[in-house]
Amino acid sequence: MLIIPAIDIKEGKCVRLTRGDFAQKKIYLDNPCDMAVIWRKQNAKMIHVVDLDAALTGETVNFERIREIVNVLDIPIQVGGGIRSVEAVEKYLDIGVSRVVIGSAAVTNPGLIADLLKKYRPSQIVVGIDAEHGVPKIKGWTESSNMQDYELAGEMKKLGVERIIYTDITRDGMLQGVGYETTKRFAEKAGMKVTASGGATTSDDLHKLRSLEKYGVDSVIIGKALYECNFPCQELWYAYEQGLGIDGEFSTARKKECCS
């Protein structure tokens, strides 16, 4: 089970949202690149980056921030958020992004997926399905699609997509545990490789997800739980942050009993 730390960028800063609500935004670091370095020091094997501004506007607002992350790390970076054209995909892949995540466009313009898979490998183009009670949400989670999550996955599979990043919106950023049954249901019906996202909060959640490997769930994206130091043995993280001179009020710079 591959653990993939998440970095969400809004107005150039590293933030986390609660259930995708832009009004419930918490800033963790002014420079997302510093966050990426911290993840790598914690032995991350891949980083998941989302341009939240682009998710709303469709414009690659935080492109330079993402370029900085790619340039400073030696591991694969996957990027999502408002990527709705071949040109946008090319722009990211040209700077060294390993994998591009297509979200809203998979619903509104499935032909884009077909075009991309004619040009790029399936490992470079993945589809993100962000669902609320089984219904995919698009355009920064502000609109609903007219199909079920597994139906969208089926259409993508026909086009040659091999992996879905599946986010349970009801769990995202809530620190209330992973949506095990929801993820299991989706993975069983999709019959594809699945990266789970949304709600993973404790090691128990990771064990639950690992039990879904037989259904294709082989990785998980974790955001707020890591930022809030919910997992044991994050003492190394704390020590490294002090070396960067990061403000002690930054949540993950607080020692917790689990780290002592």
Curated annotation (Swiss-Prot):
Cited SUPFAM superfamilies: Ribulose-phoshate binding barrel (SSF51366)
Entry's localization field: Cytoplasm
A cellular component term, taken from the record's GO annotations: cytoplasm
Catalytic residues (positions): 8, 130
Main location: cytoplasm
One BP annotation, GO: L-histidine biosynthetic process
Reactions performed catalytically: 1-(5-phospho-beta-D-ribosyl)-5-[(5-phospho-beta-D-ribosylamino)methylideneamino]imidazole-4-carboxamide = 5-[(5-phospho-1-deoxy-D-ribulos-1-ylimino)methylamino]-1-(5-phospho-beta-D-ribosyl)imidazole-4-carboxamide
Pathway linked to the protein: Amino-acid biosynthesis; L-histidine biosynthesis; L-histidine from 5-phospho-alpha-D-ribose 1-diphosphate: step 4/9
Keywords (A to Z) from UniProt: Amino-acid biosynthesis, Cytoplasm, Histidine biosynthesis, Isomerase
A single GO molecular function term of this UniProt record: 1-(5-phosphoribosyl)-5-[(5-phosphoribosylamino)methylideneamino]imidazole-4-carboxamide isomerase activity
Highest taxon of the lineage: Bacteria
Major enzyme class: isomerase
EC number assigned by the record: 5.3.1.16
Family: Belongs to the HisA/HisF family.
PANTHER family: 1-(5-PHOSPHORIBOSYL)-5-[(5-PHOSPHORIBOSYLAMINO)METHYLIDENEAMINO] IMIDAZOLE-4-CARBOXAMIDE ISOMERASE
UniProt protein name: 1-(5-phosphoribosyl)-5-[(5-phosphoribosylamino)methylideneamino] imidazole-4-carboxamide isomerase
Organism of this sequence: Chlorobaculum tepidum (strain ATCC 49652 / DSM 12025 / NBRC 103806 / TLS) (Chlorobium tepidum)
